[in-house]
Amino acid sequence: MKFKQDFFTQLPEFYSQVYPQGITKPEWLAWSDDAAQLIGLSQPTDELLLGLSGNAAVDGATYYAQVYSGHQFGGYTPRLGDGRSIILGEAIGPNGAWDVALKGGGPTPYSRRGDGRAVMRSAVREFLVSEALHHLHVPTTRALAVIGSDLPVWRESQETAAITVRLARSHIRFGHFEFFCHSERGRADKLIQLLNFTITQHYPHLSCDAAGYKAWFLQVVQDTAKMIAHWQAVGFAHGVMNTDNMSILGDSFDFGPFAFLDTFQEDFICNHSDPEGRYAFGQQPGIGLWNLQRLAQALTPVIPSDDLIAILNQYQEALVQPYLRLMRAKLGLSAVDVPSVEQDKQDLDLIGRFTVLMEKNQLDYTQTWRQLGKLDPTSKHSALRDDFIDVSQFDTWYQAYQQRLGAVADIPAWQTERNSVNPKYILRNYLAQEAIIAVEEGNLAPLHLLQKILTQPFAEHAEHEDLAKRPPDWGQGLIMSCSS
């Protein structure tokens, strides 16, 4: 790997230098070939294993943990920072630079009495969801590898430590800006320094002046809205949408008790620590705006409040338009040639009525969409009909759907197109749990198979139909904890 160290050299007050503590008996548990290509790597090697497990220095790495703050479950925490993630620097790849971070690399000045470690189950989950989201075309950070060990760590019980090697276009979060506005009051100079660095590194087409700052914030609003639109379309619940878990680039970030929907449930809660459902699936669009409002507050020393409010008012449209594009594709609806508020409203109503029917009939979100690939959209009798208990309500919806759909000239091509946007396979929590149990027993095959399937989620994989099934009773609606 070749590194540059722009964050390290240009923002010395934004981190603490800290070196990883190696894990014992490191071994490769998982590796992503296409993530490796992002930073110019090919195959895992013994030398790389030593370096990324913290047992040897990596040439060109500088090792640091970033400081930031954030709103967690609605309350402001003035000092957070990387409590168990150590960044090596920005690795230069063929198409840009990616931060390389060792998540679980050991304690840092921001560990808050924690051990700085990650357990194997959380490392595997982060790796798998990074692979899954990327191949579902959802903006996300990536995971290069999972490195296991025999190092014992204690959570609710004894587990073993592991490291996720995370790749991110940037680790700058909403919380970085909050820290230098609220926690370090009077440091507007540092806020501007961070803002200029972010624009120079990631938005080079913008200028570092008043006009550029406003254009940048609008881009952040749009990118955040687009990310959440993808989440809602694919049925992904993040679970911990604190502002310190929000990437400034609109990439899905910092995965913990996430889940993909099994049975469609608008108020689905995937986080055991969120009993009131602040971060429930259906709340994510609103929380996205709330988090952007907190970021806007932090930017008031730099951008006038009236301008910030005007930009925030564009969030709804920035969310609805990509969501409509994604959902129209899932349903096979033709794109709207001339934007129409009335047509958007009608399509949103059609989509909403369909998901309400899914919830009332307790249907699997992913499987129901996939069924469209078997549908003859010209037939009065839908193959979907048998899945619905309340067939009269479905018939009413289906009639409206056919009317909006219009004529379909090539039915096989239409069906193939539906299968290209409606995945057959998602990372169901129970599948991740089964892979984790197998790893604990020394069997990596289920993990590697699941990874393979998740990198081709739209393919049939007829020999692995079992991985597309609804979860068994024990795996239905699994709720995870933040313990990791």
Swiss-Prot record:
Mg(2+) binds at residues 245, 254. Disulfide bonds: none annotated. Its EC number is 2.7.7.-, 2.7.7.108. It catalyses: L-seryl-[protein] + ATP = 3-O-(5'-adenylyl)-L-seryl-[protein] + diphosphate; L-threonyl-[protein] + ATP = 3-O-(5'-adenylyl)-L-threonyl-[protein] + diphosphate; L-tyrosyl-[protein] + ATP = O-(5'-adenylyl)-L-tyrosyl-[protein] + diphosphate; L-histidyl-[protein] + UTP = N(tele)-(5'-uridylyl)-L-histidyl-[protein] + diphosphate. GO terms for molecular function: AMPylase activity; ATP binding; magnesium ion binding. The keyword Ligase does not apply. Keywords: ATP-binding, Magnesium, Manganese, Metal-binding, Nucleotide-binding, Nucleotidyltransferase, Transferase. ATP binds at residues 81, 83-84, 103, 115-116, 166, 173, 254. Its cofactor is Mg(2+); Mn(2+). Belongs to the SELO family. NCBIfam families: PRK00029.1. Nucleotidyltransferase involved in the post-translational modification of proteins. It can catalyze the addition of adenosine monophosphate (AMP) or uridine monophosphate (UMP) to a protein, resulting in modifications known as AMPylation and UMPylation. This is Protein nucleotidyltransferase YdiU. The gene is ydiU.
